[in-house]
Structure formats: structure tokens, C-alpha cells
Amino acid sequence: MQTLAQHLSSQGIQAPLAQLLTTLADTSKAISHAVRHGALAGVLGATEQENVQGETQKKLDVITNDMLKEALTADSTVRGLASEEEDHIVEVGQSGDFLVCFDPLDGSSNIDINSLVGTIFSVLPAPSGELSEQSFLQPGRQQVAAGYVLYGPSTMLALTTGQGVQLFTLNPETNEYLLTNEAMSISKDTSEFAINMSNQRFWEAPMQTYIADLLLGKIGPREKSFNMRWIAAMVGDVHRVLSRGGLFTYPTDNKNPEKPYKLRLMYEANPMSFLVEQAGGKASTGYETIMDILPSEIHQRVAVILGSANEVDACLEYHGQDYSEEPSL
């Protein structure tokens, strides 16, 4: 099996990007160690702080953010970074080639119940000139690399540099990432979907009708049965989609009219969309392709529908219909 370093070399990845990806991978090993120790290290539970999103920070949110921030600040290839846990961008150096956006610990509500969590990252080219928030506001198509690390029964790194999606598994004996799937591929069709059903009454009419038709199974217009899955961590649900197909969505809702979207574009939706598209899937808000969106600010939120191409298309057909009346559920 190839190590991560061997794979990056065989793919012809230039030295600066290889260095940055190695920094991210090495930091994820330390994060994996911290996550595994959990209560033994006193890192579970919440802090008294809130992040810029107004969300209460878990202790591990802060710890993992600091670990990534410290490692990336020391990496000469990094010009600046943006994190879910940082109010503003962080300028790192004057000459780095890359900007890094990341969610240090996705699914942190799962920490205290010992369920799946992960790290998501996106790498963008650093433009010339003075660094500002505007420097980061690039469409997802500009990403040069993206990936996530899943901290589960084993620690796995899914990575794309625009040459498909590769999956690496951390060998606990050698502490090396080894290539265990050289070409992750999403099936075009599926009978699985992932959505937070507790928000059903708050969804837009197209999504309500789409999900209602899935739940009707063989007696409904789709004429086949579907199973629902929900891990409550985007990183876990998207990993399942990449592993065996499916559709994952966190759609628009009016639960809080001031926050109609849940997921962040720059460090959740964009990197996951890059991975999904590279594996043969599709990613949309319901009305536009996610990676074509020009961001308006670093913590911008969007609706997300991604996964098996034909099922995403089926969902989008509902969004193109006329809903002058609310569907009956």
C-alpha cells in the first residue's frame, strides 16, 4: 500500500501543495489522538464560549481549532486561513501560495456520545496583493484540493486534488496514512437518503413533496422503497455517500427566518461538493450548483443537496415545479 507521501509524489503534486497536505494530515493524526482519549484527557463537554455562528463551542472545537491554526501558521506555504471557530480570517505569512478554510471538528454535538466526528478542509490559491477577506471569496471551482478526516472506528482521510478521490486509512501501529481506495466512486442511482426529518414542517414545498414521495416507497410515484440514514455529522453522512452512494441534504428551512441555511459554504459545502463531483456525483443548493457560487462572506451558509447524480437530478426536478399550494403530508 502506498503512503500518503508516496501517493502525492506519484500523482505529480507540486512540492508546496504536497507540503500543505502533509501538514493537514499530520495535524489530523494529533486530533485523532485527542478525540480517542476523550474523557480520559478531560476534553469532553462544552465551554462557556460561542463562535461567530452563535453556537456554543465544545472543548474539542477549541482544542482542534488551535491545533490546526498552530500547524498551518508554521507552514510556509500558507498565506492565510479561515475557520468555523474564528470570527475573522487569520493572516499567516506574506509569501504563501495557499489559503486554507476548515471546520476543525464537524459534528461536535456527537462528541459527548462517542459518535462520528471529523475535520473538513478546503485549499484555495492565494491571490497576489494585500490579504483580506475578499481574497478568500472564490468560487468552489477554484479549489486546488479538498478533503476530510473521519474519526471513527478507524481514522480515514478522503482527499482530492482534482484527480478523483482517494481514501487513506491511518495505520495505528506506524501512524502512517495508507492508500486503501484509489478511486472512490458514487453510484448514479441509490435507494438511501439522509436528512434531518425533525425539520420537515419548516422545509420549502419542493423538498417536502420530494421527501414525501420517497417515503411512499413502491406505492408512490418513485415506485421503489428508500431507506433513511442520519448520522448528524455532515462528514459521516458524506462519507457514506462516497462509500456506497446515496443522497445527503440539509435544505432551506424557515425554522429561523434569519438563518434559512445550516451548512457553511467555504469550509463545508464547497470541499464536500468538490469531493462528490470528483467521485461522479452532483452537488446543488436546489437552484444552483454549489461550486459555482461566488461567496459573499467567509461564514456564508447555503442549502446543500449532494450525492448520487440521478437522485440529485430527481430532487432538482421538484425544485423546478410550480408550488402554488402547499403539499399535504
Curated annotation (Swiss-Prot):
Instruction: Name the needed cofactors.
Output: Mg(2+)
Q: What is its main location?
A: cytoplasm
Task: Please give the biological process terms from Gene Ontology that the record holds.
Answer: fructose 1,6-bisphosphate metabolic process; fructose 6-phosphate metabolic process; fructose metabolic process; gluconeogenesis; sucrose biosynthetic process
InterPro entries xrefs: FBPase_C_dom, FBPase_class-1, FBPase_N, FBPtase
**Keyword field:** Carbohydrate metabolism, Cytoplasm, Hydrolase, Magnesium, Metal-binding
Subcellular localization is given as: Cytoplasm
Locate the residues binding substrate.
Answer: 106-109, 196, 262
Per the entry, the cofactor note is: Binds 2 magnesium ions per subunit.
Enzyme Commission no: 3.1.3.11
- Residue ranges spanning the membrane: these are none
Q: What class of enzyme is it?
A: hydrolase
Pathway listed for it? Carbohydrate biosynthesis; gluconeogenesis
Q: Where, in this chain's numbering, is Mg(2+) 2 bound?
A: 103, 106, 268
Return the GO cellular component terms, semicolon-separated. Answer: cytosol
Q: Which reaction does it catalyse?
A: beta-D-fructose 1,6-bisphosphate + H2O = beta-D-fructose 6-phosphate + phosphate
Which GO MF terms are attached to this record?
fructose 1,6-bisphosphate 1-phosphatase activity; magnesium ion binding
Summarize where Mg(2+) 1 binds, as residue positions.
Answer: 84, 103, 105
Oligomeric state and interaction partners are given as: Homotetramer.
Question: Into which family does the record put it?
Answer: Belongs to the FBPase class 1 family.
Q: State what protein this is by name.
A: Fructose-1,6-bisphosphatase class 1
Name of the encoding gene: fbp
